[in-house]
Structures are given as structure tokens and as C-alpha cells.
Amino acid sequence: MSELIVSRQQRVLLLTLNRPAARNALNNALLMQLVNELEAAATDTSISVCVITGNARFFAAGADLNEMAEKDLAATLNDTRPQLWARLQAFNKPLIAAVNGYALGAGCELALLCDVVVAGENARFGLPEITLGIMPGAGGTQRLIRSVGKSLASKMVLSGESITAQQAQQAGLVSDVFPSDLTLEYALQLASKMARHSPLALQAAKQALRQSQEVALQAGLAQERQLFTLLAATEDRHEGISAFLQKRTPDFKGR
């Protein structure tokens, strides 16, 4: 049985974490499969958006502790996981997390890495690494504080406490909360809506949004303007404006 189920709905790629016995713990093998699928999707012009989900009880409950327990300092220094996370971060198309149940530790970090997080009412988000004598190591401290602010992020990281889907939405980590049996359906609807837009515009807009968290305002504004200008030379820009003026649905080609 595959630990990552891959399916397609038109221009949307769906990746389902499938390690139920391990609560979808993100071991190196599963991370590598995620990386491979996303890197293939990045260059596949027939794919515009990707959705990552788990099961009804667990999005992903963290890293694989059995795998971690085997590593001493030397093994940790030579761990490939930082490179795998960097490759996930480099995905250039919209990435949506559809979260039901627990998103803890590395599972929460995976959700934070996504562009949009939608959650079921039963979802919980947390970084409990402190209870194990360690700390988040895959972007949790950096992305959580940018998402929910200093006070709540510090409380979660330093106490190990998790928050509900409703609290996550109020804090800005989650965009929408739904009955748990509708979470994936809504995420796929949102992905399909995004996928109707110009692939070039989607990628440029994602790049600009990401830059806003990584550079100073003036540098971000300059990058935004550069990307806006580059889109002016595309066929999709001409098609989008023409379709609007002619009151018809645009037919974007990604050119």
C-alpha cells in the first residue's frame, strides 16, 4: 500500500498522506515522495494547483519518532530532511492544505508551508516538540510567528499546547473551517477555482506573496512591480482583458 496516494481532478493534483498506522507521521520516505510529486508537478503544464490532505483523524501527527530516535548528533548534522523541506518550499504553484484531525509537529509545519490552509471542525494545530526535549526544526518557529503573531506562537512553541481549528482561523493560520466531512470537498473546489486562472499569473502572484514574508516592504514592492510588468508581455494577459471586455470566459494557455 502506497504511503502517498496520488490522484488528479483536471488541473488539480491531490496528494493524500497514507500512513494511518503511524498517524501519517512524516518519515524521510514520505517526505521524499512528496518532494518527487511536487517537483514533477512544478514542470507539468497540465497541473496548476496542488492539494495535500490526510485522513479524518490525522493530517500528520508529526515526524516519525522511531526514525528520530535512531539519530545521534552526527546523524542529525548530516540529516537530509532540511534539504527535503527546502525543496517542498520551492514548489512554484498554489499549495492548499486540507486538514482534518491533528496537524502536529512536522504536520503543522507542512500545513504552515502551504499557501492556504482549510480545516475541518475537528482539526488541531500544534508544535509539541518542547515536550520531547527538542524544538521545531522544519520552519515551525519562523512560519508560525509570521502566521499568528509573536504572543500566540510563543505560547504554542514554549508550552507545547495545540489550538483548535476555530482558534487557528481567528489567528490567521486557517482561512476557512468546515464540517470535517466537507473539508476536502471545499479544498478541491477552491483549487479548481484557482486552476481556472492563468498559470503564469498564479505563479507570479504566489512568488510575490511569499516575498512579502521574506524581504523588507520596499524590496517586496519592487518585486511585485517587476512580476506585474513581466505578465504584461504574456498572451494570457491579453486574453484575460479581452475576455472581460467581450463578456466571455477566458481561455488561458499559460503563455
Swiss-Prot record:
Enzyme Commission number: 4.2.1.17
Pfam families, A to Z: ECH_1
Keyword Transport: no
Gene3D superfamilies in UniProt: 2-enoyl-CoA Hydratase, Chain A, domain 1 (3.90.226.10), Lyase 2-enoyl-coa Hydratase, Chain A, domain 2 (1.10.12.10)
GO MF, one annotated term: identical protein binding
InterPro entries: ClpP/crotonase-like_dom_sf (IPR029045), Enoyl-CoA_hyd/isom_CS (IPR018376), Enoyl-CoA_hydra/iso (IPR001753), Enoyl-CoA_hydra_C (IPR014748)
Stated induction or repression of this protein's expression: Activated by cAMP receptor protein (CRP), integration host factor (IHF) and by phenylacetyl-coenzyme A (PA-CoA) that prevents PaaX from binding its target sequences. Inhibited by PaaX.
The entry's keywords: Fatty acid metabolism, Lipid metabolism, Lyase
Recorded metabolic or biological pathway in which this protein acts: Aromatic compound metabolism; phenylacetate degradation
Organism superkingdom: Bacteria
Catalytic activity of the protein: a (3S)-3-hydroxyacyl-CoA = a (2E)-enoyl-CoA + H2O; a 4-saturated-(3S)-3-hydroxyacyl-CoA = a (3E)-enoyl-CoA + H2O
Leading EC class: lyase
GO biological process: fatty acid beta-oxidation; phenylacetate catabolic process
Phenotypic effect of disruption: Mutants accumulate delta3-dehydroadipate and are unable to use phenylacetate as a carbon source.
Cellular component, GO annotation: catalytic complex
NCBIfam families according to UniProt: PRK09674.1 (NF007239)
Function: Catalyzes the reversible conversion of enzymatically produced 2,3-dehydroadipyl-CoA into 3-hydroxyadipyl-CoA.
Family to which the UniProt record says this protein belongs: Belongs to the enoyl-CoA hydratase/isomerase family.
Protein name: 2,3-dehydroadipyl-CoA hydratase
Species the sequence originates in: Escherichia coli (strain K12)
